[in-house]
Amino acid sequence: MKNTALHKAQLQRMSEITIEHYDRVADDYWYGTRNHDVSQNYEAFLEAIEGKPPFDILDLGCGPGRDLQYFNSMGHAVMGLDGSEALVFIARLNSGCEVLQQNFLAMDLPEHRFDGVFANASLFHVPSQELPRILLEVYTTLKSRGVLFCSNPRGNNEEGLEGSRYSCFFDLDTWRDYVIDAGFIEVHHYFRPTGLPRDRQPWLATVWRKG
């Protein structure tokens, strides 16, 4: 996959292709991921948020709502956002939470609204040329010293259309540069699944605080 700049129409089309993929596989995606153990990610995210719960949380790229269900069950005020109409429908049904249907490239987020933004396996679909703008929008929607959690598949800074999804695979240093440039301070990072050799840990999880 090549890292080449996309013009506006190409960006829109890559986004549409990715969303159409999730619309097609929405039910299978729910049944295939609903029992995944991401408790390590929940703990890393919630432990970094300052103050006393319950917290105001945005699940960015919430998919079919597994994580919405968890945060809601813990008493937090959680809102979801996803670009796929089919996934949004399932997420609302599963969680009972408010879920916004918004394309990542055209979000409309309130300012200074959330204690934390949980972006589990979602931001890697944002083309790198748009990532600074998207991260700034996330920064703006967080309250002072709010927390951003991200988990993305890692790689050697390749990006492009992978099958029917646009994907970016950053290494740690490159991902750090993007998020730090948006104004965030790194809290910590880790690789998943835990307990395996690094070459068998394809996921990079990072926790950030609004600077």
Segments and roles (model prediction):
Residues 2-52:
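Conserved class I S-adenosyl-L-methionine
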Residues 105-117:
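A short acidic, Gly/Pro-enriched loop at the edge of an enzyme's catalytic core
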Residues 195-211:
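Core SAM-dependent methyltransferase catalytic element
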